[in-house]
Amino acid sequence: MKIGLPLALQECLTQLSFVALCAFVNRLGLTASSGYGVACKIVNFAMLIPSSLMQSMASFVSQNVGAGNEQRAKKSMFTGMGIGLVIGCVVFAFIMFKGNLLTAIFTTDAAVIENGFDYLKGFAPETILTAILFSMIGYFNGHDDTVWVMIQGLAQTLLVRLPLAYYMSIQPNASLTMIGLAAPVATVFGILLNGGRYIHNNRKK
């Protein structure tokens, strides 16, 4: 319960936040909504690598913490960041500059392709930033610090991503690019939170 409940609650609220994001995007019209739907398919695929890193990181860190090898656990987090950043930069470049080729896989409607590409342009930095954030989350999960993982995840979503996405959606010149930018901004906030937590924990030791 101590480990599973916070993660389950975070996942539930995260899924609800995606419903809210869809509502914000719907304000821009049917074409924008369709483009967002197409872009989300690509986003889900792009997030597979950092998600895999996070899961493997949690397992590796927990093994080393259990063996009393904290230094190796820390080293694995930074190694994961490095691997993720290299892959993330490649994915970023492709999504940022050739994202229309990816959206064209799912539709032949030119307007939907461009709207999907617009969202991907704002979202693109997320492919790099999550390499850092997800490695940190994996590190904390490996230490059974799941309550903190839940708190920082909810803070990102409720304090930054949703308010910023909503604000961008009600602007006179609202665009999917600006709404998409809410994700990497929230991730930067998450990196700062987790960085502070990491420093605080190490000072206590």
What is each stretch, according to the model?
Residues M1-A20, F24, F45-I49, L53, ...:
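Hydrophobic faces of transmembrane alpha-helices in multi-pass small-molecule transporters and flippases
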Residues M1-L5, V61-E126, S169-K205:
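Short alpha-helical transmembrane segments in multi-pass integral membrane proteins
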Residues L7, E11, V19, A23, ...:
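Transmembrane alpha-helix boundary and packing residues in multipass membrane permease domains
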Residues C12-K41, F45, Q63-N64, T103-A110, ...:
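Helix-terminus/linker motif at the lipid-water interface of multi-pass membrane proteins
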Residues L13, S17, L21, V25, ...:
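Alpha-helical membrane-inserting segments
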Residues T31-A32, T146-V147, S175-L176:
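Membrane-helix interface segments
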Residues G35-G99, T130-Q152:
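Small-residue-rich hydrophobic transmembrane alpha-helices
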Residues S51-M54, F123-G142, W148-V160, L164, ...:
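Short runs within selected transmembrane alpha-helices of multi-pass transporters and secretion channels
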